[in-house]
């Protein structure tokens, strides 16, 4: 069975991590050393060497400050998608706040690439049962794809019973195709296996085994995500507040 998997990237810097949001003020973002250019180019090089096309969910705030990087991602044949503008949890926003943030980021990205932005991913997969209203707003603003619903149980995100396969969601404003990050059903629970911190925690052979099982047994694509800062061996330290955050 020939299954095409999905490699996705959340383009943000190390100090944007949601675990630090109460300790790193947005007004101070520009005071931190930026690592996003070098790390994203390192990732672009890896993808090019292996002939992989990816979807890059770019933070609007970053796109304003590194427009050449967004153009380079686009010029190298990758899809440029939206990660919002301010890196705020969706369920901490009012619907019209979310819409304004969505439009602001989309307009910046479309101006830089000359192409319509069709896909969106929320910070920390924060479209949960509390914020399903965001799906209708996405559809009403012309988005066709979303990757914000994580079918797991987590203190910050997740809808444990959500469909783990790529599927269509019908909203009053039109349809969206949802691309959940991959999970494996183990001991009656959905276990996240599709990248991010989970990729760093698990041995590589486990991830490869799960990828193969999702492709072969379930016949569906493996949806993987990574942040550029996760490839940085010299990442500056931000005062982590707990061992789990670190």
Where are these regions (language model features)?
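Active-site beta->alpha N-cap acidic-glycine motif
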Residues: 1-79
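Non-membrane alpha-helical structural segments and their capping/turn regions in soluble enzymes
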Residues: 33, 37, 95-103, 204
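Active-site-adjacent pocket scaffolds in enzyme catalytic domains
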Residues: 110, 115-118, 122-225
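Alpha-helical packing segments of well-folded alpha/beta enzyme cores
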Residues: 39-43, 50, 65, 69, ...
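Short acidic/His/Gly/Ser-rich catalytic and metal-binding motifs that mark active-site loops
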Residues: 14-19, 187-189, 233-238
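Generic enzyme active-site microenvironment
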Residues: 8-11, 81, 121, 225
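Metal-dependent polysaccharide deacetylase catalytic core of the NodB/CE4 family, i.e.
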Residues: 50-131, 143, 148-153, 174-175, ...
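An amphipathic alpha-helical core segment
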Residues: 214-246
């Amino acid at each position: 069975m020939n299954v095409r998997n999905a490699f996705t990237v959340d383009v943000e810097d190390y100090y944007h991590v949601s675990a630090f949001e109460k300790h790193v003020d947005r007004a101070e973002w520009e005071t931190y050393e930026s690592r996003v250019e070098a790390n994203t180019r390192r990732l672009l090089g890896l993808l090019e060497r292996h002939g992989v096309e990816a979807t890059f969910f770019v933070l609007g705030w970053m796109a304003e400050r590194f427009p050449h990087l967004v153009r380079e991602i686009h010029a190298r044949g990758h899809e440029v998608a939206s990660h919002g503008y301010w890196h705020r949890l969706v369920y901490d926003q009012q619907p019209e706040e979310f819409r304004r943030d969505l439009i602001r980021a989309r307009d910046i990205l479309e101006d830089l690439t000359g192409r319509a932005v069709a896909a969106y991913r929320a910070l920390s997969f924060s479209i949960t049962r509390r914020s399903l209203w965001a799906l209708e707003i996405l559809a009403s603003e012309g988005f066709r794809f979303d990757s914000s619903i994580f079918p797991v149980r987590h203190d910050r995100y997740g809808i444990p019973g959500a469909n783990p396969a790529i599927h269509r969601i019908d909203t009053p404003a039109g349809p969206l195709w949802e691309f959940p990050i991959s999970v494996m059903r183990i001991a009656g629970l959905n276990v996240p296996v599709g990248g991010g911190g989970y990729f760093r925690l698990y041995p590589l052979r486990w991830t490869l085994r799960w990828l193969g099982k999702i492709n072969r047994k379930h016949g569906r694509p493996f949806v993987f995500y990574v942040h550029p800062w996760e490839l940085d061996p010299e990442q500056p330290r931000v005062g982590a507040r707990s061992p789990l955050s670190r």
